[in-house]
């Protein structure tokens, strides 16, 4: 089968599905070139990125919306269900998910994402929104993963006076709160 690979900024529904199916899962830096590398040289069967780019083993290592559409159409026909029913089934089995991104103005350019991540990591609380921090990753900025699979990713631009913050929880209200925390954490000197 192969593993599932996705950009670090993409939501965790894919991760939860892979976990339940015992399929290896990994993340890569933001940018299709990084997940294409996983398809070409590292045994990925499927790769995805936040902007809707999906690629499949055995095809071109490029974002392929047509193949993705055809696979979804085949699934709809085989399951004899409409798309909203399939989405409802996914939510029932794997939980609701709300993913949002926010661009946050910074007072100065932060060309080194890793040093930013190290500084913020030192100041992290033990819990966020009432949930323990389970792990942190520094693949591309700083990703904070909570014990319940909620997460926050902070990626300074490196060339602009801004940081992209991405978050996923089970509701829009909680996701907005997570992005508000990113604003506070980004103020760390």
How would you describe each model-predicted region?
Residues 1-189:
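Phosphate-binding and adjacent anionic-ligand microenvironments
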């Amino acid at each position: 089968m192969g593993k599932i690979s996705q950009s670090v900024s993409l939501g965790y529904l894919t991760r939860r599905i892979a976990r339940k199916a015992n399929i290896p899962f990994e993340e890569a830096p933001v940018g299709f070139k990084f997940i294409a590398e996983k398809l070409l040289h590292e045994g990925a069967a499927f790769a995805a990125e936040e902007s809707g780019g999906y690629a499949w083993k055995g095809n071109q290592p490029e974002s392929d919306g047509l193949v993705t559409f055809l696979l979804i159409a085949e699934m709809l026909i085989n399951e004899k269900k409409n798309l909203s029913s399939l989405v409802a089934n996914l939510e029932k089995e794997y939980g609701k998910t709300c993913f949002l991104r926010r661009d946050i103005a910074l007072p100065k350019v932060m060309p080194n994402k890793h040093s930013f991540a190290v500084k913020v990591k030192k100041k992290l609380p033990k819990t966020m929104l009432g949930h323990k921090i389970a792990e942190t990753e520094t693949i591309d900025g700083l990703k904070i993963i909570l014990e319940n699979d909620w997460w926050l990713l902070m990626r300074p631009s490196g060339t602009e006076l801004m940081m992209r913050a991405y978050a996923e929880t089970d509701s829009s209200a909680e996701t907005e709160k997570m992005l508000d925390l990113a604003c506070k954490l980004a103020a760390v000197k």
